[in-house]
From Swiss-Prot:
One GO CC term, this protein: photosystem II
Source organism (scientific name): Oryza sativa subsp. indica
Family membership noted in the UniProt record: Belongs to the PsbB/PsbC family. PsbC subfamily.
Residue positions assigned to the propeptide: 1-14
Chain positions with N-acetylthreonine modification: 15
Name the record gives this protein: Photosystem II CP43 reaction center protein
Molecular function in Gene Ontology: chlorophyll binding; electron transporter, transferring electrons within the cyclic electron transport pathway of photosynthesis activity; metal ion binding
Swiss-Prot/TrEMBL GO biological process terms: photosynthetic electron transport in photosystem II
Keyword Acetylation: yes
InterPro entries assigned: PS_antenna-like (IPR000932), PS_II_antenna-like_sf (IPR036001), PSII_PsbC (IPR005869), PSII_PsbC_sf (IPR044900)
């Protein structure tokens, strides 16, 4: 009878309908894994696994470059980015490339350069991936011991972790350098409606930076998602950069303590599960950030947040009716509460009507009209600028409400356009990906723990009906 498992390891296997199928010598009989199990066949082949990872990086970078050029080719400067279904150009614009006051795109050439650089990089990665997958050594331990590893070698694994942390720290510092020295980044809070500026007064106080982590995640607090000035964002990246770099050096120079050796499972599949768990957390945080935060994700490029569009509608009609003679300070709505303005339970003046639920919105077009006790009535009567009216009217009709294949905007709004907000796309995709990565984390963690406990995973295949059926071919 066929052996349905590898003698070299205790991974469960799937049985091919056609057991004679062989793929480049890495077949089920020799590896314990069917062809569709992909990189699982390469668990003990460090050279081939390197090729798979480099090729994967090439695919990722190729998508970034190709999609970047696709968005450049379709970009219409006269329309806002968020009305054109763009998800990459807003990121480049946020970094200060190609834009000027008010988020107006002045030059698309930097976006073209970005796309070409990514395409060239993807070609290099692609060739490297193909080389290591097909031509390079199957294992690295003999020829290149620095790059070789054994999954159970705890010291080597933490060294690899340290190298990754240092690279992440360098990435954080690159943003800091761009903001401080290389042209600055886009600040939606710059006076007059946003502009590109260099960050000159970093927030480095640990009380402020780490205070975000201690905040409640709920309304009015908002955990780290509530950050609303670039000094805090860039200062946070300085802290993150140092933590990652010094943490990386620590992990390279030290060996895991006894408690860590006991607490963790030390196998390739366990490391996969840890990585998927971390990516899941990142996905959920990114979802909340892009949905609620209009500083890291400026509304000029990504469209308004949900609360921002709602408050913009209240503001737009306050402006209109005030011009028509309404006394916005005292007019009553159908419920007896203020039609345009009302007081929150804590006494602040806020917009009335249904948008009262979004009382804690902060947006650059609205904040100049606030006083010490909320919205200032005298400023609402005398100080509203044309750019604030234009921006709120635009945001009112571009709420991030549409499902991914619908006519977006507010369903009852006659001025709505066929539009889906990039915030909807990015928040939805990151939530869904975060969820699936979490499921993958649970799956691989369960398998890794079972293997470490020493029992076979999967079900007994001996009596599986498919084994007695005629092959499909």
């Amino acid at each position: 009878m066929k052996i349905l498992y590898s003698l070299r390891r205790f991974y469960h296997v799937e049985t091919l309908f056609n057991g004679t199928f062989v793929l480049a010598g890495r077949d089920q009989e020799t590896t314990g894994f069917a062809w569709w199990a992909g990189n699982a066949r390469l668990i003990n082949l460090s050279g081939k696994l390197l090729g798979a990872h480099v090729a994967h990086a090439g695919l990722i970078v190729f998508w970034a470059g190709a999609m970047n050029l696709f968005e450049v080719a379709h970009f219409v400067p006269e329309k806002p980015m968020y009305e054109q279904g763009l998800i990459l150009l807003p990121h480049l614009a946020t970094l200060g490339w190609g834009v000027g006051p008010g988020g107006e795109v002045l030059d698309t050439f930097p976006y073209f350069v970005s796309g070409v650089l990514h395409l060239i990089s993807s070609a290099v990665l692609g060739f490297g991936g193909i080389y290591h997958a097909l031509l390079g050594p199957e294992t690295l331990e003999e020829s290149f011991p620095f790059f070789g590893y054994v999954w159970k070698d705890r010291n080597k694994m933490t060294t690899i972790l340290g190298i990754h942390l240092i690279l992440l720290g360098i990435g954080a510092f690159l943003l800091v350098l761009k903001a401080l020295y290389f042209g600055g980044i886009y600040d939606t809070w710059a006076p007059g409606g946003g502009d590109v500026r260099k960050i000159t007064n970093l927030t480095l106080s640990p009380g402020v930076i780490f205070g975000y982590l201690l905040k409640s995640p709920f309304g009015g607090e908002g955990w780290i998602v509530s950050v609303d000035d670039l000094e805090d964002i860039i200062g946070g990246h300085v802290w993150l950069g140092f933590i990652c770099v010094f943490g990386g050096i620590w992990h390279i120079l030290t060996k895991p303590f006894a408690w860590a050796r006991r607490a963790f499972v030390w196998s390739g599949e366990a490391y996969l599960s840890y990585s998927l768990g971390a990516l899941s957390v990142f996905g959920f945080i990114a979802c909340c950030f892009v949905w609620f935060n209009n500083t890291a994700y400026p509304s000029e490029f990504y469209g308004p947040t949900g609360p921002e569009a709602s408050q913009a509608q209240a503001f737009t009609f306050l402006v209109r009716d005030q011009r028509l003679g309404a006394n916005v300070g005292s007019a009553q709505g159908p419920t007896g509460l203020g039609k345009y303005l009302m007081r929150s339970p804590t006494g602040e003046v806020i917009f009335g009507g249904e948008t009262m639920r979004f009382w804690d919105l902060r947006a650059p077009w609205l904040e100049p009209l606030r006083g010490p006790n909320g919205l200032d009535l005298s400023r609402l009567k005398k100080d509203i600028q044309p750019w604030q009216e234009r921006r709120s009217a635009e945001y009112m009709t571009h709420a991030p409400l549409g499902s991914l294949n619908s006519v977006g905007g507010v369903a009852t709004e006659i001025n709505a356009v066929n539009y889906v907000s990039p915030r909807s796309w990015l928040a939805t995709s990151h939530f869904v990906l975060g969820f699936f990565f979490f499921v993958g984390h649970l799956w691989h963690a369960g398998r890794a723990r079972a293997a470490a406990a020493g029992f076979e995973k999967g079900i007994d295949r001996d009596l599986e009906p498919v084994l007695y059926m005629t092959p499909l071919n």
